[in-house]
Regions:
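Short linear motifs at secondary-structure transitions and domain/linker junctions
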Residues: 16-24, 54-58
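Long, charged, mostly alpha-helical binding arms that flank functional sites
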Residues: 36-191
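A short glycine/serine-rich beta->alpha loop
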Residues: 2, 6-17
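Short, surface-exposed alpha-helical recognition segments that flank or form part
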Residues: 13-14, 18, 135, 139
């Protein structure tokens, strides 16, 4: 039962250094034994280099353990860093990139927290909301709609770097720096009318 549910696999991440040995021979073996290919897609990963510019290696002593990153900045900052790599390209580990991911996630969290403090338990229909859109609301919804298209296309092509940079640009600049700052006055007006 497990075999039928998991074979063939949807995707196989693969380092470019072992394509010939693992990906090629796995494909040949599976075709010979089952008549089926072992996976639908292969995503080629680059190698991770240390801050010294050399491939991470225990013998070189330039390995940064994921636990060390997670302990200082959290798993999501590490995921954000990893998502910024371009398939097939090598990536250099740099603490400043981890810190940037951490700052972005903090910005995202703070925006979410700010918005959730403004949402009340009242039931409001979509028609009521739609009837109160102003040009700025339509602008941010247009930006969000465009972001959805870009992210869907990037995901379909395993282009996670475009995905994360597009989301970051939207959240940080369009949503937080422009939209939230521009509509804050609405909150203060509603407090005055109470």
């Amino acid at each position: 039962e497990g075999y039928e549910n998991n074979f063939p696999a949807n995707i196989r991440p693969q380092g470019h250094d072992i394509i010939r040995t693992w990906a090629f021979y796995t494909t040949l073996r599976c075709l010979a034994l089952t008549g089926k290919k072992p996976f639908d897609d292969i995503v080629i990963n680059g190698m991770v280099f240390g801050e010294d510019g050399y491939k991470m290696s225990k013998s070189r002593g330039n390995v940064i353990a994921p636990d060390e990153v997670i302990e200082q900045y959290g798993a999501d900052a590490l995921r954000t860093w990893a998502a910024n790599s371009v398939p097939g390209s090598d990536v250099i580990f740099d603490w400043k990139d981890i810190k940037h991911g951490y700052r972005f996630l903090r910005k995202f969290w703070n925006a979410f927290r700010f918005i959730s403090m403004q949402i009340f338990d009242e039931e409001v229909s979509y028609d009521e909301i739609k009837g109160n859109f102003d040009p700025l609301d339509l602008w941010i919804l247009s930006k969000l709609n465009n972001l959805n298209k870009v992210v869907d296309n990037a995901f379909a092509n395993y282009d996670f770097a475009t995905t994360i940079t597009s989301i970051e640009k939207f959240i940080w600049h369009d949503f937080c720096d422009e939209y939230i700052e521009a509509v804050k006055y609405r909150l203060y007006l509603s407090l005055i009318h109470i």
